[in-house]
């Protein structure tokens, strides 16, 4: 079967202290796995990348209590093709943007640490978007988007300027008990970050709702429960572009 195209699946490179209980944050397991599976099942090739070519999973995201049946099956089966794709993760500076029709950015609080400063990933996102590609992100993954320039904007604005977007919001941070951990590190909540970038931030009904926003070629989702729907929405947008 011919490939539908190629997706660049982005993970944070950060793995380190964050949670009040002493556990480390990293890329969220389900937010990397589920989009990978959605894209593969739809016939896309998937290349994993991070700024440094390395990633580790958020400690909380791989606790047994956090894994649903699909995630548990993949986590326990190291012959699952996801693990082979993970071994082939490449640093962002080794990626050719011309190969990709979709960039999908996974979350986890780790994204807050490195994606705002991940200049090689930001450049790739800028190039893919300028080439009529789709930028999709879920949970904390959207944190990178305000730092991605829209090259077609004469004012040098970001790709989310004037766009409706969503992400893990300030209410969610309160529910998780990590608002103070963000403040201690001078990290803005995503509501504030997007509004400063000129985007229209759309809050979900609840922090745990499966909720996405699509505005042009920008696709965003709120949380791990939205990983599947966000990836599916990105596919729908990308396929619609072929027909125009």
Swiss-Prot record:
GO MF annotations, alphabetized: glyoxalase III activity
GO biological process, one term: cellular detoxification
EC number: 4.2.1.130
SUPFAM superfamilies: Class I glutamine amidotransferase-like
Record Gene3D superfamilies: 3.40.50.880
Catalytic activity: methylglyoxal + H2O = (R)-lactate + H(+)
InterPro entries: Class_I_gatase-like, DJ-1/PfpI, Prot/Nucl_acid_deglycase
Highest taxon in the source lineage: Eukaryota
Compartmental location: Cytoplasm; Nucleus
GO cellular component: cytoplasm; cytosol; nucleus
GTP-binding in keyword set: no
Annotated catalytic residues: 139, 140, 173
Keyword match Cytoplasm: yes
UniProtKB keywords: Cytoplasm, Lyase, Nucleus, Stress response
Function, as annotated: Catalyzes the conversion of methylglyoxal (MG) to D-lactate in a single glutathione (GSH)-independent step. May play a role in detoxifying endogenously produced glyoxals. Involved in protection against reactive oxygen species (ROS).
Annotated family: Belongs to the peptidase C56 family. HSP31-like subfamily.
Protein name: Glutathione-independent glyoxalase hsp3101
